[in-house]
């Protein structure tokens, strides 16, 4: 309950809450429906290991999940551009960030390899029977198979259930700070279908939800998008997170308790037992961003619903993203551009060995992971650090000198600017705030000259030696002997 002084006595406000805003469980017209049986399409997979393998071109890793089958651990794709990205596993569990994958998470991150919980879920609901399921294997797994395809800069989930053929494609544009989700739905049954598609995101807007829950508040943009802010995140001030869709009919809530209920949980959200979300936003809630839209499909009819989750530095930036990506053609154009970007980068160097498996890894996947996961995202399922490591990202930069020399050059100069005037360096630091640690790790000092020499040899760019950057200044580290003395 959110109480405001201007609305009068407590007794009046609680009556309003229990009257105007209360909504009853919906009574569904029928219970149960015969589900169409689908045969999983034949897949040409190389090196199939019982769970998945590469497609015939080696450009996608394809995972096949049938009833009762799970990968040994979460198998994920780290998808990013230079300022924004998300991690998604084969179950559909996902976390999204902007600018810093640890310090500025938009949604929750978890590295629990058993449960693999998600901060973002797309639910479906049959408006006739009330049955709910998720487009991805998590959190509501159905009996029919799932096909998951991790590609360069995108992931796709294919699934058929309840007469509906689903195809969900998730990606980030080449430069915009927004995650785009194309949900393609086709009615494969012989009857008209009315469905709800619901995007649920547990907001963080910081490092961990436990530390930001009391600071995040939600509101409605004049264009219908949901906005979330955290004015206490001083490292990323003024940022506005938004959730939007191309669909016109929409209902929403920013109250996680309303959506999940006291005993509902992700598998049985209480709000989905009711007709629609309550259109409640504001402060004082356990926050989330949840958006519901309703779709009607005739037999064999197909439609596309676009969900977008992103961040802008101003309301104008958010408005521009919403306007741009409510247009489905522009979304597909952005997808084509993202695929073309990775195709161009990854084909610049081709390696041919007698081992086909080695060729697949060397001609795409290793370089893709180095750039998307290591240099840009600096995150993974095991560890979500967000920081630049002085030696780590210099090592990574060596892998891209021949294909993206500008990125390697930028990385060298960035690390040069994190040297102290005494000659030691920041072992790691967070972009934005530049918070980090100062150490005496000696191997850090070796990597800057080593990588610079390699860069010059491979590019001929001796001008980099003429570049000037500033040193860091701070109180010098204490003498190591003085530091150790109390322990001797």
Task: Identify the residue ranges that each predicted region occupies.
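Aromatic-rich carbohydrate-recognition surfaces in CAZymes
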Residues: 123, 300, 400-408, 412-488
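Anionic coordination/interaction segments
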Residues: 1-394, 406-414, 418, 454-459
């Amino acid at each position: 309950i959110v109480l405001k002084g201007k609305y009068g006595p407590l007794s009046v406000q609680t009556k309003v809450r229990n009257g105007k805003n209360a909504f009853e469980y919906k009574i569904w017209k029928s219970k149960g429906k015969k589900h169409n049986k689908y045969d999983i399409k034949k897949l040409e997979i190389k090196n199939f290991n019982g769970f998945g393998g590469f497609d015939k071109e080696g450009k996608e890793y394809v995972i096949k999940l049938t009833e009762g089958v799970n990968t040994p651990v979460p198998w994920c794709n780290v998808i990013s551009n230079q300022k924004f990205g998300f991690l998604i596993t084969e179950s559909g569990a996902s976390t999204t960030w902007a600018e810093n994958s640890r310090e500025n998470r938009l949604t929750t991150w978890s590295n629990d390899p058993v449960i693999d919980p998600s901060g973002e879920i797309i639910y479906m609901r049959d408006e006739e029977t009330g049955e709910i399921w998720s487009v991805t294997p998590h959190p509501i797994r159905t009996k029919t198979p799932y096909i998951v395809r991790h590609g360069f800069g995108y992931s796709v989930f294919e699934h058929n259930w309840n007469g509906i053929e689903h195809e969900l494609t998730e990606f980030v544009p080449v430069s915009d700070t927004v995650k785009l989700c194309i949900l393609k739905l086709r009615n494969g049954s012989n009857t008209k279908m009315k469905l709800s598609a619901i995007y649920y995101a547990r907001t963080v807007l910081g490092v961990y939800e436990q530390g930001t829950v009391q600071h995040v508040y939600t509101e409605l943009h004049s264009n219908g998008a949901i906005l979330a802010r955290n004015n206490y995140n001083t490292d990323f001030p003024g940022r506005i997170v938004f959730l939007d869709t191309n669909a016109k009919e929409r209902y929403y809530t920013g109250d996680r308790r309303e959506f999940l209920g006291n005993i509902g949980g992700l598998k049985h959200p209480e709000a989905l037992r009711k007709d629609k979300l309550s259109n409640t936003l504001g402060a004082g809630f356990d926050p989330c961003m949840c958006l519901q839209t309703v779709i009607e499909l005739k037999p064999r009819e197909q439609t596309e619903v676009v969900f977008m989750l992103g961040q802008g530095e101003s309301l104008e930036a958010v408005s521009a993203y919403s306007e741009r990506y409510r247009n489905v053609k522009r979304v597909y154009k952005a997808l084509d551009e993202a695929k073309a970007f990775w195709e161009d980068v990854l084909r610049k160097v081709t390696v041919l060995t007698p081992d086909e498996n080695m060729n697949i890894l060397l001609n795409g996947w290793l370089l893709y992971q180095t750039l998307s996961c290591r240099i840009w995202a600096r995150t993974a399922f095991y560890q979500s650090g967000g920081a630049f490591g002085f030696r780590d990202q210099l090592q990574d930069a060596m892998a891209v000198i021949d294909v993206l020399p500008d990125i390697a050059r930028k990385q060298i100069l960035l690390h040069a600017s994190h040297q102290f005037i005494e000659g030691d360096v920041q072992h790691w630091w967070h972009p934005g705030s530049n918070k980090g640690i100062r150490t005496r790790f000696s191997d850090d000092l070796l990597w800057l000259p080593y990588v610079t020499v390699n860069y010059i040899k491979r590019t001929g760019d001796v001008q980099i030696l003429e570049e000037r950057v500033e040193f860091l200044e701070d109180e010098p580290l204490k003498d190591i002997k003085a530091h150790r003395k109390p322990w001797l």
